[in-house]
Curated annotation (Swiss-Prot):
Renumbered residue ranges of the record's region Catalytic: 243-534
SMART domains hit by this protein: tRNA_SAD
Domain of life of the source: Bacteria
GO cellular component term of the entry, any: cytosol
Primary role: Catalyzes the attachment of threonine to tRNA(Thr) in a two-step reaction: L-threonine is first activated by ATP to form Thr-AMP and then transferred to the acceptor end of tRNA(Thr). Also edits incorrectly charged L-seryl-tRNA(Thr).
Record's keyword terms, sorted: Aminoacyl-tRNA synthetase, ATP-binding, Cytoplasm, Ligase, Metal-binding, Nucleotide-binding, Protein biosynthesis, RNA-binding, tRNA-binding, Zinc
Requisite cofactors: Zn(2+)
Disulfide bonds: none
Organism, as annotated: Histophilus somni (strain 2336) (Haemophilus somnus)
Name the record gives this protein: Threonine--tRNA ligase
Compartments, record wording: Cytoplasm
Keyword Cytoplasm: yes
Cofactor stoichiometry and binding remark: Binds 1 zinc ion per subunit.
Amino acid sequence: MPIITLPDGSQRQFDNPVSVLEVAQSIGSGLAKATIAGRVNGERRDASDMISEDANLEIITAKDEDGLEIIRHSTAHLLGHAIKQLFPNVKMAIGPTIDNGFYYDIDLDRSLTQEDIDTLEKRMLELAKTNYDVIKKRVSWQEARDTFESRAEPYKIAILDENIAKDDQPALYHHEEYIDMCRGPHVPNMRFCHHFKLMKVAGAYWRGNSDNKMLQRIYGTAWADKKQLADYLHRLEEAAKRDHRKIGKALNLYHMQEEAPGMVFWHNDGWTIFRELETFVRTKLKEYDYQEVKGPFMMDRVLWERTGHWQNYADLMFTTQSENREYAIKPMNCPGHVQIFNQGLKSYRDLPIRMAEFGSCHRNEPSGSLHGLMRVRGFTQDDAHIFCTEDQIESEVTSCIKMVYDIYSTFGFTDIFVKLSTRPEKRIGEDVMWDRAEQGLANALKHNGLEYEIQEGEGAFYGPKIEFALRDCLDREWQCGTIQLDFALPGRLDATYVAEDNARRTPVMIHRAILGSIERFIGIITEEYAGFFPAWLAPIQAVVMNITDSQADYVQKVVKQFSEAGLRVKADIRNEKVGFKIREHTLRRVPYMLVCGDKEIVENKIAVRTRKGTDLGTFSVEEFVEILKQQVRKRELTLLGE
């Protein structure tokens, strides 16, 4: 007679074993209809699963994050159901969930076309709208293998042979005549899987191994209702419009080419944005009392062996040889900073030492993972390392957190998710040290009034870390900032300081990055602003243009006044209609268009309009120079009149 305890603390007693769905029915028909699955003592279970002992139960519906994931997983099975009907000889591999959707890897003797995808999506919807029940059956390992042998499914057999113990009882999910194998849980009925779309087809090696056969991977998205699906597709459309690769080309910011994969060729306007970001961060480095240093691009293999990178990171490192010595081009700045710290005797009175670098790093990322500025091989880190005592951890982390939020807010990012990653199973150091480190990070977050999610066991082997993820205007998350405690590297590289008792001690090192990669951050803000950079970041802050040739000299005089004030302004005195010039520079997203006609010459003024088409009227040249200088100095996000 199981007693079921519900989330509100109430209890229900049953005379016999009871399913998750039956418990929901005992509460109410509305809840039963909405039930997708349940959490039994915290473990996700199918709605049909029986509970025979006392347990805590939470009902999972489409409103839950888990519910949405289950819908997506079941929609992957729906895809399998449909494709087996359309292509009976297809071999099914794996179909997991991913962010915002799912995919299924298939082995088919021909490439799928867009017409095939459209037909497949139509068949999926036809099947889903019959609202058939999904039946779960636990069977013996041998029965499962026999089932897939009879259906000529070699990939399912391989999963059984390689991943499932012979004394296990795998779950088979029956979608009418289609059978799939999965840990589950899955929806009890296909009425939950009506809102989906197939997105694209790509290639994928079986087991992710390039030695294996190339399969076709069908990607899809699935949501709980029609509005969620429509909103997501709208966000994708907006993301396509804001794609930093398209905008970068349209605004002539940078380019990339086959001869240098993953490397950026910065054009003048893109490099202007890059340098403005560096200048801004440098002002913050001074404000927060950092030293700026510069380490070498490559160092001897011996050093990388001492740090552990050669053993654990070699696949991502570019190497070269000279005079019978092997070198690695640095993938990160930290070993070089320890070398700088090691020059000269350090006392506890010298700590903390905050060392920052705009370090040019290189990582041999797989070519298939490269993506514009978001994933590159050559990048610049706004990296810093703080050498401190254990007693200084909390105060230094607090300072880092303040700096992170200070910088992000300047760009308009205020929706920030914080995660605290704690000790992994394999780690160095005593538990007492980890207790102190994790508590120091947690205290710093609490003292700053920050809510955070704990990621158990996700810290590095050498220390816990804080991660900062930005949410952008399209509801996407970008993991940028990190604060990482490191108890290993200073010791590996013999970093010491003289403590108050005259003993030699190893400092704690705090790795700190805010923008992360400057290249990637430019990609992020390009999409956030859709190329409409605020005036302080815009490569050209204003264009001064004439109406007729008679105003050309006045235009040059105005440009000189702005340039002497340190502003990025250029003249457009081409023999073109002023409307044509305005349209052209509007497409270039130049913040301000300054028009000079005969009237403006007489009054020593300029007519000002914004790239959004707002007519701001006329200003004296001196007046608008000061307005623009103030916008740049304050790093304002909006233009005048917006």
